[in-house]
Amino acid sequence: MRTLWIMAVLLVGVKGHLMQFENMIKKVTGRSGIWWYGSYGCYCGKGGEGRPQDPSDRCCFVHDCCYGKVTGCDPKDDFYIYSSENGDIVCGDDDLCKKEVCECDKAAAICFRDNMDTYQNKYWFYPASNCKEESEPC
């Protein structure tokens, strides 16, 4: 029952393209992005401050920085077009901004895959109060 409640809480804030990001993470890693990265470390999930706690958390930090550089659309709400070709994610959209968002998500999904062995359960639902160190620049 507790697991169902946690999943419901994590899904409440998911909008627009964030479900595309979830699907992309699942395709690349075989893991649910919401479950594994929805509230992890200092940067995975809503918000982000302090220093990334490990390489998996750094994937989220870099993803947040990538979103911060996107202009002309809303990275969390706007849908983009992508496909999977020979196991690779291919971002294809006539809208440059949406393509950039897709590329941010693709890079994060690949980063999660490449750092799966660094994932530490102690950073799952990590308290924000532990994320007070000075943040590094993007």
UniProtKB/Swiss-Prot annotation:
Organism: Protobothrops flavoviridis
EC number: 3.1.1.4
Secretion signal, residue range per the UniProt entry: 1-16
Main location: secreted
The keyword Metal-binding is annotated on this UniProt entry: yes
Gene Ontology BP term (one): negative regulation of T cell proliferation
Active site, renumbered: 63, 105
The name this protein goes by in its record: Acidic phospholipase A2 pgPLA 1b/pgPLA 2b
Bridged cysteine pairs (disulfide): 42-131, 44-60, 59-111, 65-138, 66-104, 73-97, 91-102
Residues that hold Ca(2+) according to the record: 43, 45, 47, 64
Any Gene Ontology CC annotation: extracellular region
Cofactor: Ca(2+)
GO MF terms, alphabetically ordered: calcium ion binding; calcium-dependent phospholipase A2 activity; phospholipid binding; toxin activity
